[in-house]
Amino acid sequence: MVDKRSSPLGEVTPFLTQKTKLKVYKDVGNWQVIVGELHAKKRLGGELRYSIEELNPYLNREERNPYILNTALLEGREIKDDPHPTGAMNQLGKLEDGNVAELFFSIRTLRSPEEVLKLLSNYDVKATSMAVFAGELKDFKLGTYSSSGADYMIPHLTLRPKVQFGDNHSLSLWHTFFSEDTEITDHVKQLIADVEWMTDNIKYNGVDEDIKRLAYLRKNGVQVYGATVTGPVRELEKLKEEQEFWEFRLGRIEVWNWD
């Protein structure tokens, strides 16, 4: 996630190119851990271009899309594969109790965000984002994606907790996770509003695909096929009991920092 709490460091070059950079972080337990930096630039009358410089602590290990979109979801069928690959869960089982971690998982059927939060409500974990299905490979083709058998890893919209700014562009409301005190519709409305604003006001690579995503969401509503959660490692282990969750992948691990 991009840190929106601080003012970005911006500059305008002699050639009228706007440049800025922002910290990128992940929620691991109750900490926001810096994992990189976003660099964005826009030439006068040109496209907005950006790149993310990752602070990867490991050699020869690239970050990859952690969510699986199975062909069955595109065809309206239920995934019949083994829902619980053991890799991430085996790793969690070897961690000491005094740790928190970030865990990704995919979902066997398309679900509303409310349904996912209800499934998670029995566990002491926090959901920080969800992978949104917006018609990719079903209603329209994508320029780039990867696949392995019936599984697709695609660029996707991400549902995140709502962020709100005041009249002076200062941050007035900020959540790091989806709270039961806030209606999920508020977060969904922000997602739609953000995509509307971007496609109307910014030229960027992929804008045509986002216009199609927006049309799909307006017609069909928001459904998700994956989520990211964080919490104590013992609580994360319990998620393997949920039949709807599969393809678990372990993210960052930190020492205990949980309320």
Feature-to-residue mapping (PLM):
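Terminal interaction modules at protein C-ends
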Residues: 2-20, 24
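Intrinsic-disorder-associated interaction segments
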Residues: 5, 48, 181-184
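Residue-identity detector for threonine
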Residues: 13, 17-20, 71, 86, ...
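Extracytoplasmic beta-rich ectodomain segments of secreted or membrane-anchored proteins
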Residues: 25-26, 31-168
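Extracytoplasmic/luminal low-complexity segments enriched in Pro/Gly and acidic/polar residues
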Residues: 172-259
